[in-house]
C-alpha cells in the first residue's frame, strides 16, 4: 500500500488501516518466526495441519505481543495496556461489549491484503455459556483455576506465513489521521524484517530425559467416587427421558517445569491437527491441537462441523479401511453422530435465514494422525441483522462438549 492509498482510506473514515510487507521465508518455519519475533506475554501462534497430519495447511499466523488486552470475569471487564490495568467496570452483557469493541476496530476490507490482518485473539471459556443461558447462572462451580472467563488480545502486529509460497506478510496497523503514522508503520515493518533475518536464539533447550510421567501422577478435579456416582445419575436421567447424552468432564493436572512452548513443540510433532495454537497470556499459557471447530463465519456463510464417532488409525492401509467400515457400521456411533447433526442444525437455525440451513456433507470419515472421526457439515446463511457474537451465543459450547439437549445436559 502506498501513502496516497493510505491517506484515501483515512478520508473514507477508516482509523485502523493494515500496512503490509511481503518477504521471502523459505528458510524459516512458523515456529522459528514466533521465536524470533513474538516470544513474550500476550503473543500467539496459530497453525494448521491437513487431514492425516502429513502436510501443513497453507497459512499460519504469528501474533506479536499485544499492548492492549481485555479480561472478563463474571460481569467485570478489565482493560490492560502494557501490562497495567487502566480501566475496570461492570457490564450487564460482556458479549455485547466485545461486539462493540470489534465493530469499533474499523478495519477496511482490502482485496490485496492477506486473508487475515488482525483483530481480537484469545479464548472464551466454557463457562461463557452462562452469559447466554439464564438457567445456568445459578449453578456456577468453584473457580479452582482463578483465570478470567474471557481473555482477548488486540492483535495489531502479526505475520501471516504462507507455507505454500514460502513467503511471509508482515502486518502492522496505523491511523491515517495521525501525523507521521505511515512512516512510523514502515519503521515497525523494518524492525520486523531485521528480526526475521536474525538466527533463532537457542533459548528452548529440550529438558534432559527425566522420570516418565505415569497415569497415577495426574490429579483429578473430580475424583473416581464422585465421577462414578454422577455416571449413575446420568443413566437415570437418560432412562427418564430428560437427556439423550451428557458429557461428564474432569480436569487432570500434573506438575510441568519446562518452557510451555516446549509442550506445544511436542504436541505439534506428536499430534498435528487442523487447529493448533499456542497462546501466551503472561501467567497463563494455552496449548491445543484439535480437529474440531465451534463455528465458522465467512462471507455470511455459517458452518458447524460435528465430529463424533471415533476409531484409532490402523497400523496398515488394510486395517485402516477395516476400522473405517467398522466405525460406519457401529449403530451407537452413528446414532450419536446423527444426534449431533440435529443439534448443529438447531443451533445455527437460531441465527440463519429461514430455509437456508442444509447438511452439505454427511457421514464422511476424516483421518488424523492417530484417530479417525465421522464428520458432517452443516451450513446456513446468517441473517442480515445479526453479527458474529450472535453466532457465538447460538453455538456455545460445541455439542460434543455439552450433550443434548444442551441446557438440560449442562
Where on the chain are the PLM-derived regions?
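Extended alpha-helical targeting/anchoring segments
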Residues: 1-410
